[in-house]
From Swiss-Prot:
Its main location: nucleus. Transcription factor and proto-oncogene whose activation results in up-regulation of target genes, such as IGFII, leading to uncontrolled cell proliferation. Residues 1-30, 366-406, 447-474 are annotated as: Disordered. Residues 366-380, 455-467 have a biased composition (Low complexity). It comes from Gallus gallus. This is Zinc finger protein PLAG1. Pfam families: zf-C2H2 (PF00096), zf-C2H2_6 (PF13912). A motif (Nuclear localization signal) lies at residues 22-25. The keyword Repeat applies. SMART domains: ZnF_C2H2 (SM00355). InterPro entries: Zinc_finger, Znf_C2H2_sf, Znf_C2H2_type. SUPFAM superfamilies: beta-beta-alpha zinc fingers.
Length: 501
């Protein structure tokens, strides 16, 4: 039987075995065998020691290759991390506010703003809080510098003065100390420095003299866009307000393809010739009421003529929609009444003869009788005695309304002839002209519409030997003469007014 000798090799091996499980962290971590000659730091590789040495010498061998970017870095890793900022694509997204970042560490620093239980580094001397450990160390270094300790709390490097220490602290985070931004970008033509490269490019117009921004209102040029914007708000504020309030789609004022309703007061005025607009104002209410009667008759025949295309002297080639004309609307005077004019009162309009004349015109519409017997019968309906004397007798039994005579039914009969009523058109005369002038007001009609128009001609001397005129309408003839004289002249109006009072 074998005996166990103390100090046996197998026993030594068993006692030197490492227990199973995880190794200690200190045993697996390589030793820092490469110390820095300028400070007390040591590194586990030559590459890390070399990168650290750049912090003492200020050398940055890895430069950015982008145009207009002068940044340089101490390591290749930091250069690649910086190159991501030039890319338009931001791959790191915040899950709380959907903000995008180029770098992961920027996103990590941003997430502290959303975390209510975030770790805050608080300074015991002044009470300030910091989200990052690097910012907190930089802040502690500032307190140490003010107290006389010129050692950097980040890299434990000692400096000879406070100014050098402050400049060294800027290199750790790339930010200025104390929250004050540094003007790192200098102009190539002068000694001015700026915060960003964009400010440098904007400043270059001072040296080049280029003014590429033009004001659209006064043609003044500016070298910078913000100067143009300031000029627009200061000098052209009213123009900017008009641009904001005006609609984008403006109608063409010269041509139109749709029917435009015209105001009732302007309709008879626009139908006048341009010479009569200034020479002959409306001085008679009877003339205006004649126009109201014609408008009513034109509207009543709207089944055959929906749109009346008129040639207006005002340069408006738009068709007039007659549906917009109200038949009951009285036309207002453009000029005040003169001394020879008179207004029609409401009691005069309500004379009993108004209904009889209206029924007579309806009888004329149904068919105009050609024989003298029918004419006498129609005149008897009016209640006019053939033996009545002239109007100058002042009998006053028959008073005619000086207002407009409304036509309730459309006058579409082609046989309609007002010569039987007014008796001043020759029997065998030429046919009426399609272009009819009513009261020297010049309303134009087509041949189809001219059958309902009234024609004024100079009064004819009545031939007593003509059997066609001896139909017993002497009083009607005298009435028509006074009626037509009131249309043409204004001097006989007072006499006409006195005769019917």
């Amino acid at each position: 039987m074998a005996t166990v000798i103390p100090g046996d090799l197998s026993e030594v091996r068993d006692t030197q075995k490492v227990p199973s499980g995880k190794r200690k962290r200190g045993e697996t971590k390589p030793r820092k065998n490469f110390p820095c000659q300028l400070c007390d730091k040591a590194f586990n590789s030559v590459e890390k020691l070399k990168v650290h040495s750049y912090s003492h010498t200020g050398e940055r061998p890895y430069k950015c290759t982008q145009q207009d970017c002068t940044k340089a870095f101490v390591s290749k890793y930091k250069l690649l991390r910086h190159m991501a900022t030039h890319s338009p694509e931001k791959t790191h997204k915040c899950n709380y506010c959907e903000k995008m970042f180029h770098r992961k560490d920027h996103l990590k620093n941003h997430l502290h703003t959303h975390n209510p239980n975030k770790e805050a580094f608080k300074c015991e001397e002044c009470g300030k809080n910091y989200n990052t450990k690097l910012g907190f160390k930089r802040h502690l270094a500032l307190h140490a510098a003010t107290s006389g300790d010129l050692t950097c709390k980040v890299c434990l490097q000692t400096f000879e003065s406070t100014g050098v220490l402050l400049e060294h602290l800027k290199t750790h985070a790339g930010k200025s100390s104390g929250g004050v931004k540094e003007k790192k970008h200098q102009c190539e033509h002068c000694d001015r420095r700026f915060y960003t490269r964009k400010d440098v490019r904007r400043h270059m117009v001072v040296h080049t003299g280029r003014k590429d921004f033009l004001c659209q209102y006064c043609a003044q040029r500016f070298g910078r866009k913000d100067h143009l914007t300031r000029h627009m708000k200061k000098s052209h504020n009213q123009e900017l307000l008009k641009v904001k309030t005006e609609p984008m789609d403006l109608l063409d004022p010269f041509t139109c393809n749709v029917s435009v309703p015209i105001k009732d007061e302007l309709l008879p005025v626009m139908s006048l010739p341009s010479s009569e607009l200034t020479s002959k104002p409306f001085t008679n209410t009877l003339q205006l009421n004649l126009y109201n009667t014609q408008i009513q008759s034109m509207q009543s025949s709207a089944s055959a003529h929906q749109m009346v295309a008129t040639s207006l002297p005002l340069g408006m080639p738009c068709p007039i929609d007659m549906e917009s004309v109200h038949p009951s609307h009285q036309l207002s005077l453009k000029y005040p009444l003169s001394s020879t004019s008179y207004a029609v009162s409401m009691p005069e309009k309500e004379q009993p003869l108004k209904g009889e004349i209206e029924s007579y015109l309806m009888e004329l519409q149904s068919g105009m009788p050609s024989s003298s017997q029918d004419s006498q019968a129609s005149s008897s309906k009016l209640g006019l005695d053939p033996q009545v004397g002239p109007l100058d007798d002042g009998s006053g039994e028959v008073s005619l309304s000086k207002g407009s005579v409304p036509i309730s039914e459309p006058l579409n009969t082609p046989s309609l002839d007002f010569s039987q009523l007014f008796n001043f058109i020759p029997v065998n005369g030429p046919p009426y002209n399609p272009s009819v002038s009513v009261g020297n007001l010049g309303m134009s009609y087509t041949q189809e519409e001219a059958h309902s128009s009234m024609t004024q001609l100079p009064p004819q001397t009545q031939d007593p030997q003509d059997p066609s005129n001896s139909i017993g309408l002497g009083s009607l003839h005298s009435l028509s003469a006074a009626f037509t004289s009131s249309l043409s002249t204004t001097t006989t109006l007072p006499r006409f007014h006195q005769a019917f009072q």
